[in-house]
Curated annotation (Swiss-Prot):
Keywords: Cytoplasm, tRNA processing. InterPro entries: DsrEFH-like, Sulphur_relay_TusB, Sulphur_relay_TusB/DsrH. Part of a sulfur-relay system required for 2-thiolation of 5-methylaminomethyl-2-thiouridine (mnm(5)s(2)U) at tRNA wobble positions. It is found in: Cytoplasm. GO terms for cellular component: sulfurtransferase complex. It comes from the Bacteria. The lineage of its organism: Bacteria, Pseudomonadati, Pseudomonadota, Gammaproteobacteria, Enterobacterales. This is Protein TusB. Heterohexamer, formed by a dimer of trimers. The hexameric TusBCD complex contains 2 copies each of TusB, TusC and TusD. The TusBCD complex interacts with TusE.
Length: 95
């Protein structure tokens, strides 16, 4: 399943998201969800300890001026890879 986090992690149910994770799931951070990928932040530690791959959308990172602040443990992708993820995971959950 592809999980997409589009809201600020401060306004999202991160614990609920973590409970819903399954084998092979991936988390794509989009819109304000990219705030969860800030290196040294509270949420990046939580996500790095989760048993999933975490990915962030480059355009949303750039739009928020966060390019130099994103954890190196996060894969940063463009819209083409976003589409590939959506095809790879026909089941999706938005947070």
């Amino acid at each position: 399943m592809l999980h997409t986090l589009s809201h600020s992690p401060w306004h999202a149910d991160i614990e609920g998201l973590l409970r819903m994770l399954g084998d092979g799931d991936e988390l794509l951070l989009i819109q304000d969800g990219v705030l969860a990928a800030i290196d040294g932040g509270r949420f990046i530690e939580i996500l790095n300890n989760a048993p999933i791959k975490v990915i962030a959308l480059k355009d949303d990172i750039d739009a928020r001026g966060l390019a130099g602040q994103i954890s190196t443990k996060i894969d940063v992708v463009g819209y083409t890879d976003f589409v590939k993820l959506a095809i790879k995971h026909p089941t999706q959950m938005s947070w």
